[in-house]
């Protein structure tokens, strides 16, 4: 009897047959097997900043720091779900249909593909979140957030 998980495995071409030694362990950049978040925060300093921590053919892991009141542009993804681990501060996710999620350190937020989302740091301290996505992580940008009064200039063709 096949499961949906077997179907997923059949779609992945890079499957190993048994235990192997780690294939990557870069000293810097994506490919590090052990990432010390405190060291990144100390090196990067005050928000805003991002640090790409994990990148391979199936995974993108990005550490994101935002200043109080700061947010990203509303967007959605057509081919992957996105999720975050809140590591510091308070964040607000504003979603399609008027749904709002408030999250704090220790929370995990998962947003299904197709859902417009816009993330804002609440309170008076920097927020820190670890975002997990699937490459190439294409963003479909929106000109406004339907839940708040934030608007952005329309994207100009490159």
Where are these regions (language model features)?
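A generic "binding-loop/recognition-motif" signal
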Residues: 68-70, 79, 99, 115-116, ...
């Amino acid at each position: 009897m096949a499961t949906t998980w077997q179907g997923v495995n059949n779609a992945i071409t890079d499957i190993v047959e048994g235990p192997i030694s780690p294939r990557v362990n870069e000293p810097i950049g994506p490919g590090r097997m052990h990432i010390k978040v405190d060291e990144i925060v100390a090196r990067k300093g005050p928000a805003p900043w991002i640090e790409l921590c994990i990148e391979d053919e199936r995974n993108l892991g990005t550490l994101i720091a935002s200043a109080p009141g700061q947010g990203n542009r509303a967007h959605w993804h057509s081919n992957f779900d996105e999720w975050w681990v809140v590591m510091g501060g308070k964040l607000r996710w504003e979603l399609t249909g008027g749904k709002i999620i408030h999250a704090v350190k220790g929370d995990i937020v998962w947003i299904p593909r197709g859902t417009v989302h816009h993330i804002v740091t609440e309170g008076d301290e920097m927020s820190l979140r670890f975002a997990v996505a699937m490459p190439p992580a294409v963003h479909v940008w929106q000109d406004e957030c339907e839940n708040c009064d934030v608007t952005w200039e329309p994207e100009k063709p490159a």
